[in-house]
A protein has these predicted regions:
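Class I SAM-dependent methyltransferase Rossmann-like catalytic core
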Residues: 1-40
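Residue-level signature of catalytic and energy-coupling elements of molecular machines
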Residues: 28, 48, 84
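Conserved SAM-binding loop of SAM-dependent methyltransferases across substrates and taxa
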Residues: 51-64
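Conserved class I S-adenosyl-L-methionine
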Residues: 40-50
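Short beta-strand element of Class I
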Residues: 65-69
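S-adenosyl-L-methionine
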Residues: 71-103
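A generic local structural motif
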Residues: 29-33, 55, 71, 95-96
Length: 103
């Protein structure tokens, strides 16, 4: 097994153990650690959100004061304290839904 494959397996296992939907959740956690792009109370839109790992992380970081919206063309299971919309992000109609959610 290549080293890169072993590392992916490590994060896949860790994601499963910690309840994240994908190992990509750790990418957002690392980016946020370095650049602080999301904080408590942040409003976040995740375009192309399937399977939802980044939505999970964004919701945990933004907390109850923030709002997180995930949009994807495919079905994504609900995530507590976040909203998921199954919609085409290239459709003009999605803009109204985003504005409506964030008010």
């Amino acid at each position: 097994m290549k080293l890169i494959d072993a590392k992916r397996d490590q994060y896949r296992k860790l994601a499963h153990e910690q309840g994240f939907r994908s190992r990509a959740a750790y990418k957002l956690k690392e980016m946020n650690k370095s650049y602080r792009i999301i904080g408590p109370g942040s409003y976040v839109v995740d375009l192309g959100c399937a399977p939802g790992g980044w939505v999970q992380v964004a919701q945990k970081i933004s907390g109850n004061q923030g709002k997180v919206l995930g949009i994807d063309l495919s079905f994504v299971e609900e995530i507590p304290n976040a909203k998921i919309i199954q919609h085409d992000i290239e459709s003009i109609d999605v803009v109204d839904e985003i504005i409506s959610y964030f008010g």
